[in-house]
């Protein structure tokens, strides 16, 4: 039996026994999309398959630097950071080829904690979709820069003068991917063995930047694949004394790093709901409603889509990232690109997304907004032709320009609360407000250079 064949607890036990494993890795993804976990003994794992296991809920109450939130209701010093129950999900079993024959299982928080658990959030949104008689399918595309650096060397260099894997721009280069074929093959092999297969992997425009397209799957599995791809791409490269960054934009000299999402919808019989050959661009009424919801609600939900301070460094004109809630037909300057095609190929591309977003959180936002559009008979308000950067949309389609503004819009959104729940909205908005507060404590190198001597 292989990891991808596991669908229930009995098969999970059988595979662990077959591989004679003394310990198993289990992990949960936190609010920022960081995988937190540990090795547990075989005996504890077998018990946890039936009863779950306790995991300190601090992982839902701190930031990416393990700094404790002081502004959230769910957990904190006021609760004593108790254990929260985690349910192991057998069908998330993955091989860990970088650790011999080891296995990884994902978990998800249950009971009260599930209200702020990103994976459970996506499941709730998908349950709503199922109640409406529809199923969502998606695929993530990631751009990421690779450096000839280690976690130690980048700190020694204070994140300056870092050496990229390749020296300059050379998009789609066959020279580069041949010269670096060991790295490319390592990533392709990893993806195959961990069952997040890549449809494509190529050199992008920028020094050492790659783009990976993950295979299309049902929405929950797609988010699992995306989150694991980001995590274990970093692991694999660090084992080669290299580093990958999925920051939205790491340098002012280059465009940002996208995390585009391709999305389609079917009914329970498998019929493609975005396709209607009798309509312009094969775009069905359902697709218009779905995209209308995305366009109308993008400003309110942007905190889930652009969740870091750095996210907003990417959203500037002329750098392959949208700046308004724009929609266009096969138009890569727009936030939402409608891709006409056959019944199988008709889809949308959500291009506002950056590589730094939590896959579960952003996919929850996209699907929730689209479902709202269907329920409320929304329509595309403005369709852009030509360069979206040269056109000005109505003010209500302008996007927040910083994380604090986005967090305030999200917190005040009644639609977000109806679609996602008060507990999640309050917790996530507070976590973004915390991120802004941490940033404001910081004195940048730009400020020192500008003011230290002269002012």
Regions picked out by a protein language model, each given a short descriptive name:
Residues 1-455:
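Glycine-rich, acidic/polar active-site loops that bind/position phosphate-bearing ligands
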């Amino acid at each position: 039996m292989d990891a991808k064949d596991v669908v229930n607890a009995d098969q999970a036990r059988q595979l662990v026994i077959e591989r004679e494993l003394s310990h198993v890795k289990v992990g949960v993804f936190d609010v920022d999309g960081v995988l937190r976990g540990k090795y547990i003994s075989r005996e504890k794992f077998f018990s946890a398959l039936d009863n779950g296991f306790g995991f300190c809920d601090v992982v839902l109450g701190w930031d990416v630097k393990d700094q404790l939130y002081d502004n959230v209701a769910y957990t904190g010093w006021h609760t004593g950071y108790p254990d929260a129950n985690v349910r192991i999900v057998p069908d998330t079993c993955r091989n860990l080829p970088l650790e011999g024959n080891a296995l990884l299982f994902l978990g998800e928080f249950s009971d009260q904690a599930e209200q702020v658990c990103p994976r459970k959030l996506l499941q709730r949104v998908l349950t709503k979709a199922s109640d409406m008689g529809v199923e969502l399918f998606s695929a993530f595309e990631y751009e990421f820069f690779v450096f000839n650096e280690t976690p130690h060397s980048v700190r020694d260099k204070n994140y300056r003068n870092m050496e990229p894997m390749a020296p300059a721009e050379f998009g789609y280069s066959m020279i580069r991917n041949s010269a670096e074929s060991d790295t490319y093959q390592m990533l392709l092999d990893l993806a195959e063995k961990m069952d997040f297969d890549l449809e494509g992997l190529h050199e992008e425009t920028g020094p050492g930047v790659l783009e990976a397209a993950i295979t299309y799957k049902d929405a929950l599995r797609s988010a699992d694949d995306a989150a694991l791809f980001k995590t274990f791409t970093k692991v694999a490269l660090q084992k080669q004394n290299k580093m990958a960054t999925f920051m939205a934009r790491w340098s002012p000299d280059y465009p940002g790093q996208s995390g585009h999402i391709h999305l389609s919808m079917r009914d329970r019989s498998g019929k493609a709901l975005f396709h209607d050959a009798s309509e312009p661009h094969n775009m069905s009424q359902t697709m218009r409603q779905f995209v209308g919801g995305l366009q109308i609600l993008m400003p309110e939900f942007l905190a889930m889509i652009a969740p870091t301070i750095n996210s907003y460094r990417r959203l500037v004109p002329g750098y392959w990232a949208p700046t308004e809630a724009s929609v266009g037909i096969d138009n890569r300057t727009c936030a939402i690109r409608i891709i006409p095609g056959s019944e199988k190929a008709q889809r949308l591309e959500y291009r506002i997304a950056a590589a730094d977003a939590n896959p579960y959180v952003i996919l929850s936002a996209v699907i929730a907004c689209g479902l709202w559009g269907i329920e409320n008979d929304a329509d595309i308000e403005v369709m852009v032709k030509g360069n979206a950067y040269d056109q000005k949309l109505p003010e209500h389609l302008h996007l927040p320009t910083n994380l604090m503004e986005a967090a305030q819009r999200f917190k005040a959104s009644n639609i977000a609360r109806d679609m996602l729940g008060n507990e999640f909205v309050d917790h996530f908005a507070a976590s973004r407000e915390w991120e802004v507060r941490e940033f404001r404590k910081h004195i940048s190198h730009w400020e020192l250079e500008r003011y230290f001597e002269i002012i």
